[in-house]
Amino acid sequence: MSLTGFRGLKNNIYDLERVNNLVGENGSGKTSFLEALYLMCTGVSFLTKATETIANHTTKQFVVEGIQAGTKDSNKILVSYKQHKKTHFLNNKKTTQGKMFLKHPICLVDAFVNRVVSGTPENRRRTIDRALFHVEQEYLMEHRAYARCLKQRNKALKDRQTTKQVGAWDESLSIHGEKITRMREKHILEITASFEEMSHLFLGREAKIEFKRGWKGGSLFEALKRNTEKDRALKRTSCGPQRDDFTIGVGGKRAQTHISHGQEKMLSLSYIFSQKTTIEKQTNKNTIILFDETDSNLDEASTNKVIDYLKNVNNQILTATHPHSMLCKKLTGKTIFLKQN
């Protein structure tokens, strides 16, 4: 993997092994390195939508390039950003962001993984979307189509257009929206057994996960019609996939109300790793695990459980941690020391 002009990281070539521990102090570029690999494989950053902010301040451009070995035929992957344009290449041919998601599944554990339990519905929806982008080509198309329709309906509401003009978007919005919600709900059902198994392994307690649609009763089309006057008052669409959510419960109670930060992280990891298992079954591909701030908020016993899990999976792993962390001592692999330019 080679990096040129990516944030504050040095231009360099890195020969990655199966297990790679990125080590450095705060601000050394560990998260940026994970971001670079994620962007190379998926075409997008997990930190920002503003691609121009990733480029080196002097050159205003970057290139991330790598060779994916160990597959039937090695793939050369490249993402470049130049003159305000991002371009994706696979084996020297231009490709699309959607195809990159399908080709290179990633299991991302970022520094805010606790938000699976304690964050907003938007945080949780994003984790489902990332997983489905890797599995369902149709999902990205539906997601984009729904976003376009929602933007137009919300504009009509904000501009105080007539009820008829607002309602003109309801049919297409409901068609795309119901497909998105069905796929999300199906995904949660598919990971449920693995999630319950992982949460028992990590927490030693029974945990349940339940999907909640972003509208009540009947079809989305009916809900949009029923809520038109409410939406006109709010100047936005109040029901649909943008309101989807899921809840996690432990011992019959909502998890975020009565567990510690460490338990939150272990429960969130149970969810992320259950997604990993499901994605691998559905795609017949091993994910790459990117794990930021691996042992943050975890006691020694919990850290050992995570390390044992990572030792026993057949994945390429990149962890980001501090020089004196327990992980560096117990998870054998290549150590990459990082410093910003």
Task: Tell me the role of every PLM-derived stretch.
Residues G66, N315-H322:
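Structural recognition of the conserved hydrophobic beta-strand(s) that form the central parallel beta-sheet
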Residues M1-E25, L39, K164-I175, K179-I288, ...:
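Conserved NTPase motor "head" modules and their coupling/switch loops across ABC/AAA+ ATPases, GTPases
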Residues I106-L108, I317, G333-F337:
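Conserved beta-strand scaffold positions in the cores of enzyme catalytic domains, especially
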Residues V109, R115-F202, K212, K216:
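An accessory alpha-helical subdomain
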Residues C41-N123, L132-V135, Y139, T192-E196, ...:
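Nucleotide-state sensing region of NTPase/ATPase domains
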Residues D292-T294:
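Walker B catalytic acidic pair
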Residues K30:
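Conserved lysine of the Walker
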